[in-house]
């Protein structure tokens, strides 16, 4: 059974507190947009698709449980202000801004309808937010299917048999509404009997790989090994052939129009390693992560976080034998007074990316080495979902 990081029913929302993983599974109630803003900012919930869903549903819960004005315009203004506020919780993630924009347009349309009142505007918003939750899971399953098929058909390792894959950060059920993007590809390979082994990097400094991805892999009984970020090159060189490593698959927080991809810090390094060692480097993300208005990675704003995330580590006490969940300790691991630079993301140039896996297929570069990401939006509503979209 796949992990459930978001529990929702109309008027109620709970999120799995990811700061307490992998040692404790505790859910936090989210009652309002303010609760969601803090949960996103504090990274109790994280992952570009997940934070968009949590933000949308939090406002739906708030609207469902409050006494609203009867005037449609007043409710529209309230929703717009809350959406603008929620977007400030994680500016790098385009999914959040994209979801907010779609919900705002739906709200404006509902408010402008003949006979509209506060209740009808609320219903339009809540129904749209709930649909986003359902659609995200379906899209992730499609991403997994397309990615797995592409890897088996387009890699030397895939032609030999079950493949091994490396991944970075957390892109599974904990980062989405369910199933996952990059980790969803690994799940799909495993379900098809095509996965030999998964390797996940710890993802310093927030350790999403060791805390979250490793947790999901163990939970789903997928054969996997955890490595530190600095071991990736050695893994590809020393065990790439014996493990039949086909490539590295990662998620994305924002994909620019030219294919430049902002993702968790350390992604760029892995792309360089993949190129050097001749394995595929793939980005898995829903179309909502693709931002055609952002021309290149140079236009992406990179969030910088507190240096304490680098110099301090936090977790339950362990005496070398047993784990004491009742005692949470913070440990200093760096010289006192040292300066710290802590960008949360980096940008991987499109030239290092072999394919971008979406819910409608895998986008490849044309003969000139150029991604045409507008093609994935032309596939909107198409009954055919190709495994490859390329050379267009």
Swiss-Prot record:
GO molecular function, one term: S-methyl-5-thioribose-1-phosphate isomerase activity
Record site: Transition state stabilizer: 169
InterPro entries referenced in this protein's UniProt entry, alphabetically: IF-2B-related, IF-M1Pi, IF_2B-like_C, Initiation_fac_2B_a/b/d, M1Pi_N, NagB/RpiA_transferase-like
Record EC number: 5.3.1.23
Keyword flag Metal-binding: no
Catalytic site positions: 253 (proton donor)
Biological process annotations from GO: L-methionine salvage from methylthioadenosine
Enzyme class: isomerase
Catalytically driven reaction(s): 5-(methylsulfanyl)-alpha-D-ribose 1-phosphate = 5-(methylsulfanyl)-D-ribulose 1-phosphate
Subcellular location: Cytoplasm; Nucleus
Keywords on record: Amino-acid biosynthesis, Cytoplasm, Isomerase, Methionine biosynthesis, Nucleus
GO cellular component, one term: nucleus
Cross-referenced PANTHER family: METHYLTHIORIBOSE-1-PHOSPHATE ISOMERASE
Identification of the protein by name: Methylthioribose-1-phosphate isomerase
Organism for this UniProt entry: Pyrenophora tritici-repentis (strain Pt-1C-BFP) (Wheat tan spot fungus)
Organism placement in taxonomy: Eukaryota, Fungi, Dikarya, Ascomycota, Pezizomycotina
Gene: mri1
């Amino acid at each position: 059974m796949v992990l459930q990081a978001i529990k929702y029913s109309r008027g109620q929302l709970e999120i799995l507190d990811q700061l307490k993983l992998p040692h404790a599974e505790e859910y936090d109630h989210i009652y309002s947009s303010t609760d969601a803003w803090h949960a996103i900012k504090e990274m109790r919930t994280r992952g570009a698709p997940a934070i968009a869903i949590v933000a949308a549903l939090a406002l739906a819960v708030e609207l469902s449980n409050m006494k609203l004005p009867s005037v449609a315009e007043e409710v529209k203004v309230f929703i717009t202000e809350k959406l603008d506020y929620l977007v400030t919780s994680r500016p790098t993630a385009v999914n959040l801004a994209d979801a907010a924009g779609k919900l705002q347009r739906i709200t404006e349309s509902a408010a402008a309808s003949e006979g509209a009142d506060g209740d009808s505007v609320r219903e339009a918003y809540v129904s749209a937010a709930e649909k986003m939750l359902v659609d995200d899971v379906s899209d992730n399953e499609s991403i997994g299917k397309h990615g797995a098929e592409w890897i088996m058909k387009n890699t030397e390792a895939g032609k030999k048999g079950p493949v091994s894959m490396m991944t970075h950060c957390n892109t599974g059920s904990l980062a989405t509404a369910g199933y996952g993007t990059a980790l969803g590809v690994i799940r799909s390979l495993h379900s098809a009997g095509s996965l030999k082994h998964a390797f996940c990097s710890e993802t310093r400094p927030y350790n999403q790989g060791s805390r979250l991805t490793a947790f999901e892999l163990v939970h789903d009984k997928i054969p996997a090994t955890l490595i530190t970020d600095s071991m990736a090159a050695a893994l590809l060189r020393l065990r790439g052939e014996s493990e039949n490593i086909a490539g590295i698959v990662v998620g994305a927080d924002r994909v620019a129009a030219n294919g430049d991809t902002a993702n968790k810090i350390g992604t760029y390094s892995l792309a360089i390693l993949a190129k050097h060692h001749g394995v595929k480097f793939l980005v898995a993300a829903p179309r909502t992560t693709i931002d055609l208005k952002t021309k290149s990675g140079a236009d992406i704003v990179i969030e910088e976080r507190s240096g304490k995330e680098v110099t301090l580590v936090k977790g339950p006490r362990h005496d070398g034998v047993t784990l004491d969940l009742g005692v949470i300790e913070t440990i200093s691991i760096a010289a006192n007074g040292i300066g710290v630079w802590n960008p949360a993301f980096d940008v991987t140039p499109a030239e290092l990316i072999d394919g971008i896996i979406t819910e409608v297929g895998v986008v490849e570069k044309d003969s000139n080495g150029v991604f045409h990401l507008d093609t994935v939006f032309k596939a909107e509503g198409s009954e055919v979902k190709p495994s490859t979209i390329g050379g267009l």
